[in-house]
C-alpha cells in the first residue's frame, strides 16, 4: 500500500524494505514457505526468493516501474555454518547485489567493491552526478574510479577499520559538565 501511494504521488520517492527470514541460522519459515528441500534453511531461501520475484513482477506491472530504480542487496553472506558444510571452502562467497532499472549503464567490467560503495552507486543509478565519484568511503561503481577494495584489498580495509584513532578515543572519553559519561 505504501509503495503504491508513493509511486502514484508523482514525486521522487525512496522506500526501504527489509527481509530477514534468511538472516538467522536455519532461517525463519513463514506460512508461504514450501517444504521442498531436506533442510529448513534451503526452504526458507527458496521461499524468500519466490517472494522477491513475485514483488518484482508486481513492480513491473506498475505505472511507475520504468522510472524507478530498485536495489536488492544483502548485508553479508550467510552465517549458517551447517548449511555451508558441503560448499567447497575455496568457493568465493559474496553478498548478492543487483541494481534494476538503473539510469546508468554498467560497462561489464568486473569490480572489487564493498558495502561502502552502495551509497554513491545507488545515487548514480538514479541519475545523480557525483563530483569525483566518491561519497563517504564509497565509490560510484559506474565510474572508472578505484574503490578502496581495489586499492587496498579486503585485509587492508579491515586493518584500517580496526586501527585506533586518537581523535575517536578522546571523544569517547569525554564527560559531561556534571561529570557523567556522555
Q: What residues fall within each predicted segment?
A:
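Solvent-exposed soluble domains appended to multi-pass membrane proteins
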Residues: 1-182
Amino acid at each position: 500500500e505504501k509503495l503504491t501511494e508513493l509511486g502514484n504521488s508523482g514525486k521522487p520517492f525512496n522506500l526501504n524494505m527489509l527481509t530477514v527470514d534468511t538472516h538467522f541460522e536455519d532461517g525463519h519459515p513463514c506460512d508461504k514457505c514450501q517444504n521442498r528441500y531436506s533442510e529448513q534453511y534451503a526452504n526458507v531461501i527458496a521461499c524468500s526468493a519466490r517472494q522477491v520475484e513475485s514483488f518484482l513482477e508486481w513492480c513491473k506491472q506498475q505505472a511507475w516501474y520504468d522510472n524507478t530504480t530498485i536495489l536488492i542487496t544483502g548485508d553479508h553472506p550467510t552465517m549458517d555454518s551447517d548449511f555451508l558444510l558441503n560448499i567447497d571452502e575455496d568457493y568465493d562467497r559474496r553478498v548478492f547485489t543487483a541494481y534494476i532499472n538503473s539510469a546508468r549503464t554498467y560497462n561489464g567490467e568486473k569490480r572489487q567493491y564493498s558495502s561502502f560503495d552502495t551509497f554513491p552507486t545507488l545515487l548514480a543509478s538514479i541519475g545523480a552526478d557525483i563530483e569525483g565519484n566518491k561519497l563517504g568511503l564509497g565509490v560510484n561503481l559506474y565510474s572508472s574510479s578505484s574503490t578502496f577494495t581495489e586499492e587496498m584489498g579486503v585485509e587492508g580495509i579491515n586493518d584500517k577499520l580496526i586501527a585506533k584513532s586518537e581523535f575517536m578515543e578522546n571523544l569517547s572519553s569525554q564527560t559531561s559538565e556534571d561529570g557523567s559519561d556522555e
